[in-house]
Amino acid sequence: MKPEPGGPNAALDPRTYPDLAPDAGDPLAGLGRTAAAQGVTLAPTRPWGRWDASQDPLSVAVESDRGVCVVEFARHRHAVSVRFTRPWIGNAATADAPTLHDTVALLDAWQRQVPLDEMGRRWPYLAIEPFALALEQGRALSYRWQEVRSLPADTIDKDLVEAAYASPPLRALYPIVSHAALAFSDTPLPPHSAHFPRATPDGEHGWLVGRQDEYASAHTPAAGPDEAVDALVRLLPETGGEERGSADGDETDTKRTP
């Protein structure tokens, strides 16, 4: 969504936001003034979305190298929410900040690359997305496997998942579940290579196993989960499935992590 210039009626009511009274209710100016008073240099800021009297909330984007932060100001009540986003993840953390001072402190910590777990200790009201934390701590592989193994049976065949988890070459890859199919990747985030194999349900016949960049007609039928896993392993690229970490412990591979 492209920002639109703010008009004279875009400002917030200083009676609702007394901390914006020196700025005539302008949240952009208020963030800049508060940051300067705290000795903080904010990343580039700009209006986010429409900026007019009908817009609720009124939003500001702070574009740091770590990811875009969106600060939302509710128009009719004093409520400031902060969303910290990462590419391909979306929200990495969210918070309802009590004051502009707290908002700027959060933004400063984010753009200075303060780890998410440390930010959570400093600001207990910060809600951190588990995958974002796992990715930052080098636990994305074990987290993804735990997540996939916990999925209900109507989402993915659990026997197939457990058979894949028991296979070291597959356990070293990131599992991806989509439309009841189980695929794999060597990266925790998109773009995922189409050279890795996938097992797709084939009704009562079991699975069809093949590379994601192949036509379904070229896929190999597999009657049971063990047979499907054997086919998946045979189709791994030569550089795929190498042990970079274990789902039973931490790993340091964060390839393609922004």
Language model feature labels by segment:
Residues K2-A61, L116-P188:
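Negatively charged, low-complexity tracts enriched in Asp/Glu with abundant Ser/Thr
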Residues L31, W48, D56-V60, A93-L100, ...:
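A compositionally biased, intrinsically disordered/low-complexity signal enriched
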Residues T155, D159-L235:
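C-terminal interaction module
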Residues A36-V40, R66, E204, E238:
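Structural alpha-beta junctions
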